[in-house]
Amino acid sequence: REFAARETELMGEIAIGAGESRSMTVLSQAICTFRERYPKVTFRIFSANADDVKERLDTGILDMGLLTEPVDVGKYAFCRMKEKDRWGVLVRMDSPLAELEAVTPQDLESVPLLISGRESVQRELSNWFGNRWERLQIAATFNLILNAANMVRCGVGAALGFDLNLAFDDLRFLPLSPAMETGTVLVWKKDQVLTPAVEAFHQHIKNVQ
């Protein structure tokens, strides 16, 4: 009875930074089941790319971060998420590309592109494009795909990013061929003093993974 009372009394806020990833669904499900057990714990979610999340982790503003690879986790403790993100391109329905089932580097060579502003991600993309990378037409860079989707809708170009299973009536997502996938890690600073709520959530996410 005392143990059950302690569980219910656990309280506090857990601040998590997260990029746009399918792993956010897994994390959201974990938050839901955690709050069923600890209803007095609240969560603060900060949406940003991995570089911005790491900056806030390092300054102590965030307790944890959901980071898409490639990312240096040397100074963090981490839990690798089971979900992987599939890369592709978001195009308007009236684009000639929308008629394809998948896109190749050659298909995108003459198309204005919107790409991630992260240098580490650009290096990954350059490996996929090979010698065509230097000939690409980069129209804009972005850090959140929803803003990029608005630019696609307005005709700025096609956006390279993850398949987040979002429904756009006037846009279509096409996977890359050859396929390209990216992993995600949930990280927190090594040797940091954890609040009881954060420590309990660390254990919970490991158990549900």
Spell out what each predicted region is:
Residues 1-8:
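Alpha-helical "hinge/linker" immediately C-terminal to small N-terminal DNA-binding modules
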Residues 8, 76-87, 91-113, 196-199:
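Flexible hinge/capping segments at coil-to-helix
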Residues 11-73, 133, 140-144:
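Central regulatory/effector-binding core of bacterial HTH transcription factors
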Residues 13-17, 65, 90, 114, ...:
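Short, well-ordered beta-strand segments
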Residues 26, 30, 104, 124-125, ...:
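Short amphipathic alpha-helical coupling segments at ligand-binding clamshell hinges
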Residues 54-55, 106, 149-150:
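Alpha-helical segments flanking ligand/cofactor-binding loops in enzyme cores
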Residues 74-80, 84-86, 146-193:
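Beta-alpha-beta core module
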Residues 111-133, 194-202:
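Secondary-structure junction motif
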